[in-house]
C-alpha cells in the first residue's frame, strides 16, 4: 500500500508535501499483487480470501489453480472456489464503502480550502490561514489560498518571499493525477486509433502501461488546441444564435402581421388609445368576401337577365300558340260549316242539287286551299314543348336548338382557308383558288351553328380584315406549315390582329394546315416560331395541326371552340 494526499478535487500530490493545511492525508488501498488502485466495479474490484487478505479480481483470475482452490499470495493459505470460481468470492464491502466515500464524500477538517457560493452567485474561497478572511491570492509553490494580510505574514521570510503568488483569477489549473498510478500526474494524450481505454495517461501508462507504444502528444498543447477549436465553435454558435434570434424575431413579426392585433396610438391632442390593426389574414378574408359579394351580385344580375330572356321567349311562344289555336278554331268552324252545307245539299232533290253545283264547287276549292295551307304550316312548324337552353362562358343564355357563333377565318394567301371552309361545309375537297373578297358559309356542329366568314388573304386585301371584326366571337387563323419562309410574315400579321380592340375578347384558334406535306413544321415548332405563349398571353388560344384535304384535325379545333364558347350543354326544359 502507498500513502497519497488527496485534495478536494480528488487530485493526488506527493506525500512529502503534507505540511499544507489545504490537504488531507488519506490512505488509498491498492492491490498488493499488481499495486493498482481498487475500483468499485470491474476487474479491480477487491475480493476477500478465506485467510482475510484482499486481492483484486483480475489478479485472482491469474493465480494458479490447485484443483478447485487457490493459494493466498501472501500467506499461502488455501481458499476453495466452488462452482462459481473467482466470481463466487465475497467482495470486501468495507473497503468498497471506504473507496466510495473517498470518491463522493467530503475530505474532512483538514481538507482543501472551503468554497461557498455568495449571494451574487460568485464562488467565495476562504483563506487557508484564517477562515474568517476571504482569499485573494494563490501561492503556486505552497498551493494555498491566502488573503493579502496572511500572504504577507506567512511569506515574510526571505526564503518564502520568493514564492510566486497570483490573483485567484490567474490561479493555474491543478494537475489531475492518473487513476491507475495516482502518484503520477496526467501529462500525455493518446492519439492511437482504435484505442479503447481513456486517452489520458501518465508517464508510466505511456512507457509500461496499456498505452505502451501508442501515438501520443503532450497534454497542454492538445488541450490548448481543443480550447481554440471550442472558441471557434463558440464564435460560430454565437453567430448562429444571433441568426436564429433574428429569424425568430422576423417570424414573430410575420405572425403579428398575419394575425393583427391591438396597437396604442395617439390622437391629435396627445391622448393615447388602443386601436385594432387588421392583419393580412383579415385583409385577405375581406378581399375574398368583397370579390364573392361582387360576383354574387353579378350572377344575380345575369340570372335576372337570363330569366327575362326565357320569360320573353315563353311569352312570345305562348302568344303565337294561342294565335294558332284561334286560327285552328276558325278553320275548324269553317270546315264544319262547309261539311254541314254539303250534307244538307245531299238531302235535297235533283233540281236543287244541280242548282247548288257552282256553290259547292267554290266551297270545295276553298277547302282545298285551306287544307294546303294547313299542311304547309304543319310541315314547317314543330309542335314541341321543350325549351332548349344553352349558356355561354359569360353566362349569357341562348334559347334554341342551335347557338349561332360568328367566326372570321384569316391568314396569308394560299394557307388553305377556303379549303377548310368547304371541307367543313360539304365534306369535300376544293381545289385552291385565290379568294377575291370573302366567302360566308354556315356550318352546324353539335349544338352550335358557326357562321364562318372566309376573307381573302392577299396583301392588298388584308386592310379590309378590320371590317369583319364587329361581333366576332372567334378568330380562326390558318398557317401554311409547309412554307417556312412565310412564318415570319404570318407572325407579323397575327401580331397586328391581336392588337385590335374589337377582337380583345374573341377566341383564337390557329390551324397549322398542310401537316401531310413532307418537311412541314410541327405544331411545337410553329408555336415557338410564332411566339404564341408570349403573343397570346392573357388570351384564350389553341393551336391544332390539320390537313384540309383529309379533314384531319378540323373537328378537333371545332371541339375546342365548343368547349370554350359553351358553359353547359343544351338543356331541355319542359
Swiss-Prot record:
Zinc finger (RING-type): 31-76
Catalytic reaction equation(s): S-ubiquitinyl-[E2 ubiquitin-conjugating enzyme]-L-cysteine + [acceptor protein]-L-lysine = [E2 ubiquitin-conjugating enzyme]-L-cysteine + N(6)-ubiquitinyl-[acceptor protein]-L-lysine
UniProt xrefs under InterPro entries: Bbox_C, P-loop_NTPase, Small_GTP-bd, Small_GTPase_ARF, Small_GTPase_ARF/SAR, Znf-RING_euk, Znf_B-box, Znf_C2H2_type
Location of this chain's protein in the cell: Cytoplasm; Endomembrane system; Golgi apparatus membrane; Lysosome membrane
Annotated stretches, region: ARF-like: 390-574
UniProt entry keywords in alphabetical sequence: Coiled coil, Cytoplasm, Golgi apparatus, GTP-binding, Host-virus interaction, Immunity, Innate immunity, Lysosome, Membrane, Metal-binding, Nucleotide-binding, Transferase, Ubl conjugation pathway, Zinc, Zinc-finger
Result when mutating residue 458 to I: Suppresses GTPase activity. Decreases interaction with PSCD1
Highest taxon listed in the record's lineage: Eukaryota
Matches recorded under Pfam families: Arf, zf-B_box, zf-RING_UBOX
Gene Ontology annotations of biological process type: innate immune response; intracellular protein transport; positive regulation of autophagy; protein ubiquitination; vesicle-mediated transport
GO CC entries: cytoplasm; Golgi membrane; lysosomal membrane; nucleus; plasma membrane
Residues reported to bind GTP: 411-418, 454-458, 513-516
Pathway in which this enzyme or protein is active: Protein modification; protein ubiquitination
Record-listed E.C. numbers: 2.3.2.27
Coiled-coil residue spans: 352-379
Similarity field: In the C-terminal section; belongs to the small GTPase superfamily. Arf family.
Free-text comment about domains: The RING-type zinc finger domain is responsible for E3 ubiquitin ligase activity. This domain is catalytically active as a dimer.
Subunit structure of this chain's protein: Homodimer. Interacts with PSCD1. Interacts with UBE2D2. Interacts with TBK1 (via N-terminal kinase domain) and p62/SQSTM1. (Microbial infection) Interacts with human cytomegalovirus protein UL144; this interaction might cause autoubiquitination of TRAF6, leading to NF-kappa-B activation.
UniProt xrefs under PANTHER family: ADP RIBOSYLATION FACTOR-RELATED (PTHR11711)
Protein name: E3 ubiquitin-protein ligase TRIM23
Classification of source organism: Eukaryota, Metazoa, Chordata, Craniata, Vertebrata
Gene responsible for this protein: TRIM23
